Swiss-Prot record:
MF GO annotations: 3 iron, 4 sulfur cluster binding; 4 iron, 4 sulfur cluster binding; aconitate hydratase activity; iron ion binding
Gene Ontology cellular-component annotations: cytosol; mitochondrial matrix; mitochondrion
Record's subcellular location: Mitochondrion
Binding positions for substrate per the UniProt entry: Q99, D192, S193, H194, R474, R479, R607, S670, R671
Record's protein name: Aconitate hydratase, mitochondrial
Its EC number(s): 4.2.1.3
InterPro entries xref list: Acnase/IPM_dHydase_lsu_aba_1/3, Acoase/IPM_deHydtase_lsu_aba, Aconitase/3IPM_dehydase_swvl, Aconitase/IPM_isomerase, Aconitase_4Fe-4S_BS, Aconitase_4Fe-4S_dom, Aconitase_dom2, Aconitase_mito-like
Upper lineage: Eukaryota, Metazoa, Chordata, Craniata, Vertebrata
Underlying gene: Aco2
Main localization category: mitochondrion
Organism of this sequence: Rattus norvegicus (Rat)
Cofactor note: Binds 1 [4Fe-4S] cluster per subunit. Binding of a [3Fe-4S] cluster leads to an inactive enzyme.
Function: Catalyzes the isomerization of citrate to isocitrate via cis-aconitate.
Keywords, alphabetical: 4Fe-4S, Acetylation, Iron, Iron-sulfur, Lyase, Metal-binding, Mitochondrion, Phosphoprotein, Transit peptide, Tricarboxylic acid cycle
Biased composition, class Polar residues, residue ranges: 551-560
Transit peptide: 1-27
Length: 780
């Protein structure tokens, strides 16, 4: 623990000369800036090379690409214990990225730390708070008006603490990162679960909670459990209607939503070269849906081409020089290997209600009829951080153009979300946007929009059964439109476009015919489009705010009466005792994602106000006692009521509580609010069969106990009316289970074992009340 403590106590002095950023240490053979926006921050391939050589010599074996990049960023490569799936690594990420919904809490925590500046290059991206209603410009104007307080806070906090700020309308965080900040070999953390998008450019890009981002921005080594590595070998060539999206839809069907947990998915093999750089990004992006720590592709000519086209030929040239360190070693070993022949891969569509329910497009209509899913498609939606590249828009436009040539338009409503201002401006210039409008589409703002529930949908009523198809990444119940009866399917943008034209799930564009306006039948040809524009990208409007060199006079104000922002109060420390007689707030039945724990959509406006957003705590989770959402028994009054109200009652009356969950609890978004809220309302532990990686870490960061049943069947021993006592906290130690006494209302008791994954540093967080509390302790 000494190195951690030493670093924190020296932060105030060290940050003045930026000692903790990798770009400031040692000389280098070539000085190439990380980005155009940070000309004095350099890529350190020489340090990466040095660290890789140290680790390879220690381990005495070939390394995977994932290992090279991760171990190449070790804080102490000569002495760090390294064992896949077991040890915790202390890493030095190159940069941090935050989107506006998570940046609020991250920056509030950073302000609480008392530090003057961020220690690594960091950016804030305004993409989550723009609601889709009428179309791009109108929706953007409305969002700027409604969210002015939050945008002003983020802009001034960025200016004060040295964080770059991308204004609303600039685009989706992951597209901006790919266009400007990602590069081969980078280690980047982002406060969004789809940060792995950057793996399409050969980087290790990992989604985290805001508290993790605060550690990195503070210059503290970031902890990550040493990931296992799943190899996906690609052979053959993508062609026809089959797209990069189909690779990850197929992988999701194989590995399921938790099959990648604790692992990096590393794509390799001859088939890689048939996939564009942005296509590789699509595959890595949706790796979040299998629970993977991240996903990555090896550096190749496709990445070089993309870097050059986005104005970063100097980075491409430097990557060529260090190419041997940006690909896996021959003979490296994976923990698991999946092989996919791209020649045999068919277009896929996954859903509804879970992204791992995979179907070939040719079969989904038949399956839908059998299952009673609505066949008529109400809305087709393309775009999102997963599929909004120039190539995606071009392939969709190629499909739309064929329909227009035969006098057809979309039978379904159709929306288009450009991934960035650069993509929007370029597809406008090159005619793609107009083709998509002509076929019946509405171009939305450069933002997340309906993908995260920012959709003011008017065509149905809540509870109305319907089907939508999207090129998004997630299709959890109610995620896009807050309607639990919306059957959402995810597929490629070109398949979405074809299905929106046909209007039904029973249409297979590979084999089925459409009838043109003239009554003649025709078949859509497989789309073909340029992966990058033939001329340069059109950058569109300038939407970036540089942090000033001198920010000493910059104020960051938070009104005490604000309903959108709230300064944080420290959580209480552990009292040194076991947790006695914990009330069960809810025993959750089945899937419980972070959308169920802390809903997005209309709740996004409260992401900077912990008390207000806590009113959505677990409102989407199903209570096993009555099969209902947001209806739990108050153990004192015996009345059923909303989960947040019951939690507040317990907090007011000094009753500490626990949540019981099922498998893969907390899958999905990286939002740390799903951990902050239960802590704020008096929760002490979350006990489940298993956790999703990011959520488990977020819970630890906020001083909660994420615990798992040593015997998963013990889930069935606990009833919502029981009380639980957790023993062994005085001797809390890594690898040592805790005892849990189940106290039934009839006076009988049972004792079970609970496992945990805490290391010594994380146990310090628990004792201090949170990771932020511990940081402050070490500064004193």
């Amino acid at each position: 623990m000494a190195p951690y403590s030493l670093l924190v106590t020296r932060l105030q002095k060290a940050l003045g000369v930026r000692q903790y950023h990798v770009a400031s240490a040692l000389c280098q053979r070539a000085k190439v800036a990380m980005s155009h926006f940070e000309p004095s921050e350099y890529i350190r391939y020489d340090l990466l090379e040095k660290n890789i050589n140290i680790v390879r010599k220690r381990l005495n074996r070939p390394l995977t690409l994932s290992e090279k990049i991760v171990y190449g960023h070790l804080d102490d490569p000569a002495n760090q214990e390294i064992e896949r799936g077991k040890t915790y690594l202390r890493l030095r990420p190159d940069r941090v990225a935050m989107q506006d919904a998570t940046a609020q809490m991250a920056m509030l925590q950073f302000i609480s730390s008392g530090l003057p500046k961020v220690a690594v290059p960091s950016t804030i991206h305004c993409d989550h708070l723009i609601e889709a209603q009428l179309g791009g410009e109108k929706d953007l104007r409305r969002a700027k008006d409604i969210n002015q307080e939050v945008y002003n806070f983020l802009a001034t906090a960025g200016a004060k603490y040295g964080v770059g700020f991308w204004r609303p309308g600039s685009g989706i965080i992951h597209q901006i990162i790919l266009e400007n900040y990602a590069y081969p070999g980078v280690l980047l953390i982002g406060t969004d679960s789809h940060t792995p998008n950057g793996g399409g450019l050969g980087g290790i890009c990992i989604g985290v909670g805001g508290a993790d981002a605060v550690d990195v921005m503070a210059g503290i080594p970031w902890e990550l459990k040493c990931p296992k590595v799943i190899g996906v070998k690609l052979t053959g060539t993508l062609s026809g209607w089959t797209s990069p999206k189909d690779v990850i839809l197929k992988v999701a069907g194989i590995l399921t939503v938790k099959g990648g947990t604790g692992a990096i998915v590393e794509y390799h093999g001859p088939g890689v070269d048939s996939i564009s750089c942005t296509g590789m990004a699509t595959i890595c992006n949706m790796g979040a849906e299998i629970g993977a720590t991240t996903s990555v592709f090896p550096y190749n000519h496709r990445m070089k081409k993309y870097l050059s086209k986005t104005g970063r030929a100097d980075i491409a040239n430097l990557a060529e020089e260090f190419k041997d360190h940006l690909v896996p070693d021959p003979g490296c070993q994976y923990d698991q290997v999946i092989e996919i022949n791209l020649n045999e891969l068919k277009p896929h569509i996954n859903g509804p209600f879970t992204p791992d329910l995979a179907h070939p497009v040719a079969d989904v209509g038949t399956v839908a009829e059998k299952e009673g899913w609505p066949l008529d498609i109400r809305v087709g939606l393309i775009g999102s951080c997963t599929n909004s590249s120039y190539e995606d828009m071009g392939r969709s436009a190629a499909v739309a153009k064929q329909a227009l040539a035969h006098g057809l338009k979309c039978k379904s409503q159709f929306t288009i979300t450009p991934g960035s201002e650069q993509i929007r401006a370029t597809i406008e210039r090159d005619g793609y946007a107009q083709i998509l409008r002509d076929v019946g589409g509405i171009v939305l703002a450069n933002a997340c929009g309906p993908c995260i529930g920012q959709w003011d949908r008017k065509d149905i009523k809540k509870g109305e059964k319907n089907t939508i198809v999207t090129s998004y990444n997630r299709n959890f119940t109610g995620r896009n439109d807050a309607n639990p009866e919306t059957h959402a399917f995810v597929t490629s943008p070109e398949i979405v476009t074809a299905l929106a034209i046909a209007g039904t799930l029973k249409f297979n564009p590979e084999t089925d015919f459409l009838t043109g306006k003239d009554g003649k039948k025709f078949k859509l040809e497989a789309p073909d489009a340029d992966e990058l524009p033939r001329s340069d990208f059109d950058p569109g409007q300038d939407t970036y705010q540089h942090p000033p060199k001198d920010s000493s006079g910059q104020r960051v104000d938070v009104s005490p009466t604000s309903q959108r922002l709230q300064l944080l109060e420290p959580f209480d420390k552990w009292d040194g005792k076991d947790l006695e007689d914990l009330q069960i707030l809810i025993k959750v039945k089945g899937k419980c994602t972070t959308d169920h724990i802390s809903a997005a959509g209309p709740w996004l406006k409260f992401r900077g106000h912990l008390d207000n957003i806590s009113n959505n705590l677990l409102i989407g989770a199903i209570n096993i006692e009555n099969g209902k959402a947001n209806s739990v028994r108050n153990a004192v009054t015996q009345e059923f009521g909303p989960v947040p109200d019951t939690a507040r009652y317990y907090k007011k009356h000094g009753i500490r509580w626990v949540v019981i969950g099922d498998e893969n609890y907390g899958e999905g978004s990286s939002r740390e609010h799903a951990a902050l809220e239960p802590r704020h309302l008096g929760g002490r532990a979350i006990i489940t069969k298993s956790f999703a990686r990011i959520h488990e870490t977020n819970l630890k960061k906020q001083g909660l106990l994420p615990l798992t049943f040593a015997d998963p069947s013990d889930y069935n021993k606990i009833h919502p009316v029981d009380k639980l006592t957790i023993q062994g906290l005085k001797d809390f130690a890594p690898g040592k289970p805790l005892n849990c006494i189940i106290k039934h209302p009839n006076g009988t008791q049972e004792t079970i074992l609970l496992n945990h994954t805490f290391n010594e540093t994380q146990i310090e967080w628990f004792r201090a009340g949170s990771a932020l509390n511990r940081m402050k302790e070490l500064q004193q």
